[in-house]
A protein has these predicted regions:
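Conserved acidic donor-binding segment of nucleotide-sugar-dependent glycosyltransferases
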Residues: 306-307, 311-318, 327-333
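A charged, aromatic-enriched C-terminal amphipathic alpha-helix characteristic of glycosyltransferases
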Residues: 333-365
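Acidic donor-binding loop of glycosyltransferase active sites
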Residues: 261-277, 290
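Nucleotide-activated donor-binding/catalytic signature segment of Leloir-type glycosyltransferases, i.e.
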Residues: 236-260
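Conserved donor-binding/catalytic core segment of Leloir-type glycosyltransferases
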Residues: 185-203, 209-212, 225-226
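An aromatic- and histidine-rich active-site surface loop
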Residues: 13, 75-79, 93-113, 277
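Membrane-proximal helix-turn-helix segments that form the acceptor-binding/catalytic region
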Residues: 83-87, 110-112, 132-149
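Donor nucleotide-sugar binding/catalytic pocket of nucleotide-sugar-dependent glycosyltransferases
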Residues: 144-181
Length: 367
């Protein structure tokens, strides 16, 4: 078997943890998972250790970066040590999802351009992302220097091909994220909406809260809104909640084993984002066959269809979101079966694991 070296930033473990096991059927993999000491622990550490125990040809290297400031001399030295370890293996290719400082400028002294693949999670950096200016700077540098890339949406594929001409690019969507079977079910007579995932400004949870308050004042029918995800500034959103009885809040990192029951309680999911390149949360929604109300953005429109398996609104449009939520509440019994059936058809046709993994293998084998 040939060897791959795989380098994953902590924030992208939830993507790679689903693809690595399938690639192990073809390659030996040296997997470096990198996180910073400001985290108490790596969220997926238990799951990663279980994978390493299950597969003999997977060698897991969990790396905690200790430097407190990324622009310090210590951070540069620490990153050089990491890059030296990564390149110590004889490998067919290096695949990396890290595109920031000091990793990118230092990597040119260690990586070979011809056999390094970067995962471009955001060719277009979404509005509201923290450190967006520096992210654009170092990502742009990487995309001009290196040759090989993966994108996770068709719109990002086209953007990369037109912006950075002459690059080798392949598109493979996220593998649907299955965390197990739910043991819960929706509450009888209560239409329940779910927003799931890390709460960030560009995801516009304030829009969801305000729209929910509007719906509360417009109907006497029972409904509930579940908001589940880690947030560092929840006080900025809490202030919009006037009727806490319609909200179920889980403002924390949601352990993987609790995710199925979150979706088991919901009927619909809501993603009113201002901007997005692609969404891991949507992959979980599709996996659990929960129709979405979501923003009219290219990354969403290439996957779902309005009035067929989803309902679209203008990005972060509070009035339209309230209208769609109210429509779902008032017409749930008549619209829901067709929405779910169409969503399950989309899941079968577009997200076969075998087809997705073949895209990775075909690209890697051409290098």
């Amino acid at each position: 078997m040939e060897t791959l070296v795989w380098v994953t930033a902590e924030s992208f473990v939830e993507t790679d943890i689903h693809i690595i096991p399938m690639l192990l059927e073809r390659y030996n993999i040296e997997w470096y998972v990198v996180y910073y000491r400001r985290k108490e622990k790596l969220i997926y550490e238990t799951e990663l250790q279980k994978l390493a125990e299950r597969y003999q040809n997977l060698h897991l290297h969990i790396t905690c970066l200790m430097a407190s400031k990324i622009y310090s001399i210590e951070a540069i030295k620490e990153m050089c040590r990491l890059l030296k370890r990564v390149t110590s293996h004889r490998s067919k290719a290096v695949y990396s999802s890290i595109l920031n400082y000091p990793y990118i400028p230092l990597s040119i002294f260690y990586y070979k351009r011809k056999n390094t693949i970067f995962a471009a999670h955001n060719v277009h950096v979404p509005k509201g992302v923290s450190h967006s200016v520096s992210t654009k700077l170092y990502q742009g540098f990487a995309m001009r220097w290196y040759k090989n890339y993966q994108t996770f949406s068709k719109s990002q594929y086209e953007l990369l091909k037109t912006t950075y001409k002459g690059k080798n690019v392949f598109y493979a969507p996220f593998v649907l994220k299955d965390y197990g079977e739910p043991t819960t079910s929706p509450e009888d007579g209560v239409v329940t909406f779910l927003n799931f995932g890390r709460i960030r400004g560009y995801k516009c949870i304030d829009t969801l809260i305000r729209s929910s308050e509007t719906v509360y004042n417009a109907t006497k029918k029972k409904f509930k809104v579940i908001i589940a995800g880690e947030c560092s500034n929840w006080q900025d959103y809490q202030k919009y909640i006037k009727h806490p009885e319609i909200f179920e809040l889980h403002i924390e990192n949601i352990p993987n084993e609790q995710i199925p029951d979150m979706f088991g309680k919901a009927l619909y999911t809501v993603l009113p984002y201002q901007d997005i390149a692609q969404s891991g949360a949507l992959m979980v929604c599709i996996n659990y066959s929960k129709p979405s109300i979501l923003s009219k953005l290219p990354a969403f429109e290439e996957v779902l269809s309005d009035d067929e398996n989803a309902y679209f609104i203008e990005p972060a449009n509070e009035e339209q979101l309230a209208e769609r939520m109210l429509y779902c509440i008032n017409h749930h019994d008549e619209i829901y079966p067709a929405l779910v059936a169409n969503l399950e058809k989309t899941k079968e046709e577009q997200f076969s694991k075998e087809v997705i993994v073949k895209k990775y293998i075909d690209f890697i084998d051409r290098i």
